[in-house]
């Protein structure tokens, strides 16, 4: 965030993940000479990785790996579509398109290499972006209820969540449009997180 753009202080968008450690995990998990792997866990309440003593220790070679994340499989946009801001955050905080171009370039390069590790792509598609915001607010409220020492944790307010979600909006809406065309399986969800329909692409 200091070198590129302050908006990269907010985790989640391409360019804020440790792609190297993920690629290393895939490489080691596929190795014929498999050895145990230490895998980080994430603590949302403190908005950072858990201490190493809480990391997962994978002792046996996995048969199946489910690689989950909100932007898994996302693809880069064409540069000209980046010019028009889609929300107030882009309009006020990224007037020179530095953040948008950086995130898009990450998708085009490092994340393309990462997603090439996948054998198939299962896309869970919500009805719209406002529904995703509603679900995220509910998730944060549950986190607040389940956290004992609230003063020492980074639990977000409603306004924080809305701002946080704006950093995700561009890629999410791009996936709404294009991911159903290239995903292996598309699970269309209703407003209660239930699978409404399933589509298979050959």
Which residues make up each language-model segment?
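Conserved NTP phosphate-binding and transfer environment spanning the P-loop NTPase/kinase superfamily
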Residues: 64, 71-202
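Conserved nucleotide-sensing/catalytic segment adjacent to the nucleotide-binding pocket
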Residues: 1-47
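Acidic-enriched, low-complexity/disordered segments with a strong bias for Aspartate over Glutamate
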Residues: 18, 24, 47-48, 63, ...
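Generic hydrophobic alpha-helical membrane-segment signal
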Residues: 6, 56-57, 107
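Phosphate-binding/switch loop-helix module in NTP-utilizing enzymes
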Residues: 27-74
């Amino acid at each position: 965030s200091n070198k590129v753009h302050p908006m990269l202080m907010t985790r989640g968008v391409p360019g804020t993940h440790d792609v190297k450690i993920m690629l290393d995990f895939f490489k080691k998990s596929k190795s014929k000479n498999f050895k145990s792997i230490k895998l980080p866990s994430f603590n949302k309440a403190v908005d950072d990785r858990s201490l190493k003593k809480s990391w997962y220790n994978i002792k046996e070679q996995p048969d199946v790996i489910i690689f989950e994340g909100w932007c898994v499989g996302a693809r880069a946009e064409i540069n000209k579509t980046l010019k028009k801001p889609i929300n107030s955050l882009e309009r006020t905080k990224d007037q020179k398109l530095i953040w948008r171009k950086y995130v898009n370039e990450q998708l085009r390069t490092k994340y393309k290499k990462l997603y090439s590790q996948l054998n198939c792509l299962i896309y869970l598609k919500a009805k719209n972006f406002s529904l995703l915001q509603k679900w995220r607010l509910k998730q944060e409220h549950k986190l607040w209820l389940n956290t004992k020492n609230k003063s020492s944790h980074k639990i977000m307010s409603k306004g924080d969540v809305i701002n946080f979600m704006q950093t995700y909006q561009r890629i999410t809406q791009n996936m709404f449009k294009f991911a159903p065309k290239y995903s292996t399986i598309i699970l269309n969800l209703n407003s209660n997180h239930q699978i409404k329909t399933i589509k298979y692409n050959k």
